[in-house]
Amino acid sequence: MSISAEDLSTQPQRRKLPEIAELIDETLKAYPEKFAKRRAKHLNVYEEGKSECDVKSNIKSVPGVMTIRGCAYAGSYGVVWSPVKDMIHISHGPVGCGHYARAGRRAYYIGTTGVDTYTTMHFTSDFQEKDIVFGGDKKLAKLMDELEELFPMSKGITVQSECPIGLIGDDIEAVSKKKAAEFGKPVVPNRCEGFRGVSQSLGHHIANDSIRDWVLDPAADKHPDFESTPYDVTLLGDYNIGGDWGSRIILEEMGLRVIAQWSGDAPSRSSTASSKSKLNLLHCYRSVNYITRHMEEKYGIPYIEFNFFGPTKIKESLRQIAAFFDESIQEKAEKAIAKYQPQWDAVVEKFRPRLEGKKVMLFVGGLRPGHTIGAFEDLGMEVIGTGYEFGHNDDYQRTTHEIKGNTLIYDDVTGYEFEKFAEKLRPDLVASGVKEKYIFQKMGFPFRQMHSWDYSGPYHGPDGFAIFARDMDMAVNNPVWGLTQAPWK
């Protein structure tokens, strides 16, 4: 179906709760009865004031549907480990998974590629049929020897297991332990085979556990010369997918010392210094909450979740962070806010009249289905539907603080459901992932790819709001939408 610009401009006002509930029921009629009952638990309309979204989450997708989720391998390698710039990350298995994981997600960094940084390079054991039959441990060991010879300045190696490794039972832990002793540097095995768990969320957990067991805890007492200050913080869950250095910059402007960051533009020593932090600051809670809670329990380091999308949330987060420290930090936080306020005001003045009242449907992973809502609202836009690829119940609980009543909630939405909801609700903008991008554009909907800022960005941080506003305006108000028509029309 093609939606013209005229259709979008004449769409009805925000629907009431009963109408959206009817839309859910109508959409589910296309499914077999048993599956419809199962999917109904993942769809709901949020009622104002409730502390729950009342949707089931973190449950396996049903085989045969077009799910938007990724796998455990994507969560471990593609999200958490790959941005660690001075370690070599081996995709252990067939070449395809490693290629798409490496090429599909950006992670900006400072360094010389192939000398002291390796993020954009693809290292694979290139499993073949004979490796499935005879095992791949010897091949993995040989690969590590070659990498150590070719890249002696690397600070370590991680092994990211693909599906065949778990199926044939290779002992990557034994190989890693042996090579770590030979090389004198960490060699970290990750049992992140794609068939494990529900989604990429398990991969985050596996990566967090390997950081804890192989990097953080073993090095916790190896910093005798570390000079601590009262203002030491660690930045966690910030992956620098589009040059997102702004978060660190504004934290330093308010007087804090960022002693470690994980894992965007992060050297491996970042995690080893984290145990000395006075406060952990979480950007993406879902992907790093496991290691954060471990650090709270073992090292007594508290944490705060922050949101640097849009001026309203930036100011709110800065003041929350500053309240943990003394008055000098609180004063500097206010000075930082005052510094950027004119810039934010100018952005709102320019773009809000062009975007006021425009409706948005979100479906992303990690934090964006909730965190970006404030930035859209700063521009006068209204989020009418949102959901998580791999969210857990606590993600939806926190989202209730961001959304309004009558917002459509969809967990692990199927391709059919997402298209049907958009067709009926007629949003002015759909913000989701690369798999959805071209489908909705062919339907005539303006679209922004929110996993990697649609190859633009950054969208968060003090300077990111201007780019965010420009890109939303560029998508929504592009005259091409008045000319487009679905290819099958």
From Swiss-Prot:
Gene3D superfamilies: Nitrogenase molybdenum iron protein domain. It holds the Pfam family Oxidored_nitro. CDD domains: Nitrogenase_MoFe_alpha. GO terms for cellular component: molybdenum-iron nitrogenase complex. [8Fe-7S] cluster binds at residues 71, 97, 163. PROSITE patterns: NITROGENASE_1_1 (PS00699), NITROGENASE_1_2 (PS00090). Its cofactor is [8Fe-7S] cluster; [7Fe-Mo-9S-C-homocitryl] cluster. One of its GO terms (biological process) is nitrogen fixation. Binds 1 [8Fe-7S] cluster per heterodimer. Binds 1 [7Fe-Mo-9S-C-homocitryl] cluster per subunit. The keyword Cell membrane does not apply. It comes from the Bacteria. One of its GO terms (molecular function) is ATP binding. [7Fe-Mo-9S-C-homocitryl] cluster binds at residues 284, 451. Keywords: ATP-binding, Iron, Iron-sulfur, Metal-binding, Molybdenum, Nitrogen fixation, Nucleotide-binding, Oxidoreductase. InterPro entries: Nase/OxRdtase_comp1, Nase_comp1_asu, Nase_comp1_CS, Nase_Mo-Fe_asu. Its EC number is 1.18.6.1. It catalyses: N2 + 8 reduced [2Fe-2S]-[ferredoxin] + 16 ATP + 16 H2O = H2 + 8 oxidized [2Fe-2S]-[ferredoxin] + 2 NH4(+) + 16 ADP + 16 phosphate + 6 H(+). The keyword Nucleotide-binding applies. Belongs to the NifD/NifK/NifE/NifN family. This molybdenum-iron protein is part of the nitrogenase complex that catalyzes the key enzymatic reactions in nitrogen fixation. PANTHER family: NITROGENASE MOLYBDENUM-IRON PROTEIN ALPHA CHAIN (PTHR43457:SF1). Tetramer of two alpha and two beta chains. Forms complex with the iron protein (nitrogenase component 2). NCBIfam families: N2-ase-Ialpha, nifD. This is Nitrogenase molybdenum-iron protein alpha chain. It comes from Acidithiobacillus ferridurans. The lineage of its organism: Bacteria, Pseudomonadati, Pseudomonadota, Acidithiobacillia, Acidithiobacillales. The gene is nifD.
